[in-house]
């Protein structure tokens, strides 16, 4: 066969899935072809839309023979929306794929003799998200529109409802759009940095109390009378909304929230509950989006930490304190580190709210670990829950604290495996691993790993 060209048509068999939801295929000559929205075992008639030196991308013209794992009762918007990855396959196959992804990273990247001992799938793969951020833009007809970004773009795709979010979120978003369109308030134009409303930010608690934040392009763009009318409209239309805020973000950036906040109504925060603990949550705070699975995650972390009465716990990348507060035992001495100042304040408040003795500082973890006070804590257990990039610049400093056990919670199997390999060189062996599906229907998976301090044998240099 001649070299593959754009617009070629050919039959392909889908071999496996990738984390972005694309199916992996090979031509008869062994050339790699990626096909979105396919399932392992699909046989398809494919149309080549892009060719590079090392791979091609195709779209499905027809499914000649569907995979036994194909699941067509998914979201009607998933092919255009960039939010979900696996709406088109069975949930059982999705869980299998995610478990394999973690195991592959541990063995291939970390070179570790360790496998996931249990994968915790979600009981509910729909309506689980307690947070939504809807970008707002303008239609060709000059009306404000909102939805989610299309895959790999900043083009807004409109939709009626999101299957994985709290169902009332879409109703509130539509109400906000109605209000701003009735008053000819412009959505944001990302190319020209013009317009008023950039996004609609929603959060809900266990008892369905909701915080609503409008992210604006300038603090001067809504009059006080418009703000009062907005509060009145929301109060009348959506009794679940207990607080309304304005956030100002004038920067030409992908960062959603700016630094300036104003509370129009309510307290500016909501209270949520996980594992019997109560938490104050502000719109800017990191908070797990899947409450049910967060309880599973923290239960595993608590088992791995095995804190005894009176032991000390250092909670790194602690956010609003949820990990440390949920796994703390009787008399646990808790110290937390969090880079976001408001989140660290929330963590301190949440410790008092739950009658737990905790001290929290607002610093980047790698900087806090240079502090003499932290160096002299001598924690019995350390928990880490870093961002996707992992514990960059901190692994050696964490190991130097000499804790008996480290519990590593990760949202990225690749950086987890990389860090575990470094910890092993420094005397901490990964001995147990579990995976929790915090984000059903997406390509993301959460992992929990227990590392145990290894006694150095004679002649062993761990420096």
Model-derived features: positions:
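Short, solvent-exposed loop/turn elements at beta->coil junctions and helix N-caps
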Residues: 117-125, 190-191, 197-199, 435-438
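Extended interfacial segments that mediate partner engagement and assembly in macromolecular machines
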Residues: 61-73, 79-186, 220
């Amino acid at each position: 066969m001649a070299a593959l060209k754009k617009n070629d048509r050919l039959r392909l068999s889908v071999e496996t899935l990738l984390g972005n939801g694309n199916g992996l295929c090979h031509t008869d000559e062994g050339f790699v072809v990626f096909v979105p929205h396919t399932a392992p075992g699909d046989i398809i008639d494919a149309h080549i839309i892009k060719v590079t030196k090392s791979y091609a991308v195709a779209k499905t013209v027809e499914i000649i023979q569907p995979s036994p794992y194909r699941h067509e009762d998914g979201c009607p918007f998933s092919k255009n929306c960039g939010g979900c990855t696996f709406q088109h396959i069975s949930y059982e196959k999705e869980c299998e794929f995610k478990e394999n992804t973690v195991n592959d990273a541990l063995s291939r990247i970390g070179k570790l003799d360790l496998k996931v001992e249990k994968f915790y799938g979600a009981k509910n793969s729909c309506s689980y998200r307690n947070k939504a951020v809807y970008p707002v833009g303008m239609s060709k007809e000059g009306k404000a529109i909102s939805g989610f970004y299309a895959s790999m773009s900043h083009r807004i795709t409109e939709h009626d409802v999101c299957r994985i979010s709290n169902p009332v979120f879409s109703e509130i978003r539509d109400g906000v759009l109605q209000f701003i369109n009735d008053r000819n308030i412009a959505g944001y134009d990302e190319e020209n940095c013009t317009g008023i409303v950039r996004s609609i930010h929603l959060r809900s608690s266990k008892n369905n109390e909701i915080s609503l934040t409008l992210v604006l392009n300038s603090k001067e763009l809504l009059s006080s009378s418009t703000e009062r009318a907005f509060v009145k409209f929301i109060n009348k239309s959506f009794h679940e909304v207990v607080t309304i805020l304005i956030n100002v973000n004038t920067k030409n950036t992908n960062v959603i929230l700016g630094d300036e906040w104003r509370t129009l109504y309510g307290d500016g925060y909501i209270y949520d509950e996980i594992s019997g603990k109560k938490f104050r949550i502000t719109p800017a705070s990191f908070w797990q989006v899947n409450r049910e699975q967060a309880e599973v995650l923290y239960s595993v972390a608590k088992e791995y930490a095995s804190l005894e009465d009176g032991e000390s716990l250092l909670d790194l990348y602690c956010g609003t304190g949820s990990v440390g507060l949920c796994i703390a035992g009787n008399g646990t001495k808790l110290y937390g580190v969090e880079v976001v100042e408001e989140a660290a304040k929330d963590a301190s408040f949440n410790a008092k709210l739950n009658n737990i003795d905790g001290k929290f500082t607002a610093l980047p973890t790698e900087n806090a670990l240079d502090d003499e006070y932290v160096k002299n804590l001598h924690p019995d257990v350390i928990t880490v829950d870093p961002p996707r990039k992992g514990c960059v610049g901190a692994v050696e400093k964490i190991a130097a604290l000499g804790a008996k056990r480290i519990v590593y919670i990760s949202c990225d199997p690749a950086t987890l495996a990389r860090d575990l390999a470094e910890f092993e060189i420094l005397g901490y062996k990964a001995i147990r691993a579990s995976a929790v599906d915090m984000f059903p229907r997406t390509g993301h998976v959460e992992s929990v790993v227990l590392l145990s301090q290894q006694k150095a044998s004679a002649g062993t240099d761990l420096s």
